Amino acid sequence: MIDDILAAMDRGELIPYLGPDVLALAGASAPPSSPEALVAQLTAAATVPHKIRNNLTAAAQFIENFKHRKTIVAVMTKAFAVDAEPSDFHKWLAARPKLPLLVNAWYDDLLQKALKVRDNWGIAQGASQSEHFGEWVQYYRPDGSNIPGVERIQDGSGAKAPADAPEETLKWSTLLYQPLGGVSPGGNFIVSDSDYVEVLTEIDIQTPIPEAVQSIRRGKSFLFVGCRFANQLERSFARQIMKRSSDRHWAVLPGTPTKNEERFLAEQNIARIDMSVEDFVAKLTAGAAGSPELASIA
């Protein structure tokens, strides 16, 4: 299985999809590496009802309603704007020569830092409708400068335009897609119930998915690392982001999967790799070091 993954990577046909658990590889200075750790920081900054203290999206919504959206942004920024270095795995991924698309389904900027070694790349981040009404995605150059989105004339119906890509972004050789937003460069966060409702209302018809992502994913295989698929949000985002890709994928999923995870893996034709993220990364990078095609970059 490792050989198949490396072969797909060597052909430029693999899309790494990273979840929060990958941050455990970055050491003690890393930002929150789970929804549970993040909601603990949110509820330490603002009082929320006991029954939702462990629910990230509900706690964020309560704070947004009874404090202000700016409070959410401030707490999220404080949680993720930490002086953490990319892990060796982040750096290893960023050094792959054929890397058309990476997905980071969390709010950190470690992949951005690792990608600084590359040329001709950029960032697409999901954006909250409460802060960027009518715009699903914010685009950024490696220096953090924002690229204006495609202008559209709204017809007054309230319908939101699709996430068309500015011409400049279609020429990048590598795109980092952060569907939930990210702390850097723009402090975009899809985190509250209302944030998710806006996206999920449209995601089945792909409106919030960046145009470049829809194009690049065709015929590609996804490799999920540091992700779980236990709840509907996790499954919905993964399902819609990988739509119309190839019919072969992999997921590093240690431990006993839930019934919902088992169904999702079968539905999406995702082969489960039952090992820890640490062990998988060690095998993957060791396999690359032993591959004639990848030896020079391992």
Q: Which residues does each PLM region occupy?
A:
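SIR2/sirtuin NAD+-dependent deacylase catalytic core
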Residues: 1-298
